[in-house]
């Protein structure tokens, strides 16, 4: 009798495991180069026996919320600073498990042709969330428009500005809406990906300043829950993404075939 009980338990366990493995790997992304390249990787994964469901979000918080709620197994849309801020503010422990593409950002304008021509009191649109505002402030600093106080944190905010010679006026905007702010502000600090997603290719090519690099901190990361880090499907999908020539070609195409608009830090 014990043998049959043990056999039944084993069969139930195997059935449960099989059902879990039969579920698709659910990956949350945002539209544009991330979604397009993830779809390519998903098709290649399918050919290798891994079923992947790509779920698109236009909100910058929902992919993490969905991951916490187990509606996703993995997301691919945020850099390390954004993840750190989310974990701190929401008392979560989401983990970055691999690095993806790094979209560059810059300073753009529909009203002025150079930073030197900016008038005193010019308006600047930048992200209102902590991590992306920090990247914008760093870009303004590197462009020579502002300086920061000596003890400013890595994620410096507007309040950390020490000098502002042109008396720039800051307009804080939700990240997904930054490309639209080009019509309302004198200059906008926005990602190249955001501009391209909004159909602003010519504006993207005529930046007043570009912040480029290959460091992984501002790259987009693959993120999962702490209890899901060892999921073999997650590792398999990431390996496919990083090794696929078709994925790299799609990223290049998504960035209008402009190598200066992005980098692939995992190739360093």
Indicate residue ranges for each PLM-predicted region.
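Bacterial N-terminal signal peptides
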Residues: 7-16
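Periplasmic-binding protein-like
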Residues: 99-108, 134-141, 199-268
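Short helix-initiation/N-cap motifs at beta->coil->alpha
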Residues: 55-65, 152-180
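Beta->alpha turn/N-cap motifs
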Residues: 32, 56-60, 70, 74-84, ...
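Short, polar/charged alpha-helical segment
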Residues: 28-53
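Ligand-binding "clamshell"
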Residues: 85-97, 110-112, 184, 189, ...
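A conserved helix-loop-strand patch within extracytoplasmic ligand-binding domains
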Residues: 97-147, 248
């Amino acid at each position: 009798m014990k043998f049959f009980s043990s056999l039944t338990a084993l069969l139930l366990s195997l059935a449960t495991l099989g059902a879990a493995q039969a579920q698709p790997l659910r990956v949350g992304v945002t539209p544009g180069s991330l979604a397009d390249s993830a779809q390519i990787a998903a098709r290649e994964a399918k050919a290798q026996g891994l079923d992947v469901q790509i779920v698109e979000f236009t909100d910058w918080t929902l992919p993490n919320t969905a991951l916490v709620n187990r509606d996703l197994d993995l997301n691919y849309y945020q850099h390390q600073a954004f993840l750190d801020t989310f974990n701190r503010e929401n008392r979560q422990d989401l983990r970055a498990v691999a690095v993806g593409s790094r979209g560059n950002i810059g300073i753009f304008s529909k009203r002025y042709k150079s930073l030197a021509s900016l008038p005193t009191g010019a308006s600047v649109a930048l992200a209102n969330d902590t991590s992306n505002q920090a990247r914008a402030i760093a870009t303004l600093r590197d462009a020579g428009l502002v300086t920061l106080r000596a003890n400013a944190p890595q994620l410096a905010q507007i309040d950390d500005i020490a000098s502002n010679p042109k008396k720039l006026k800051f307009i804080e905007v939700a990240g997904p809406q930054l490309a639209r702010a080009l019509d309302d502000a004198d200059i906008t600090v926005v990602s190249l990906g955001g501009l391209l997603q909004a159909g602003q290719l010519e504006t993207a090519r005529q930046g007043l300043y570009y912040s480029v690099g290959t460091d992984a901190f501002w790259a987009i990361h693959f993120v999962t829950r702490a209890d899901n880090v060892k999921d073999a499907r997650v590792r398999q999908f990431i390996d496919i993404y990083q090794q696929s020539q078709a994925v790299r070609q799609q990223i290049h195409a998504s960035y209008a075939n402009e190598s200066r608009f992005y980098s692939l830090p995992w190739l360093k």
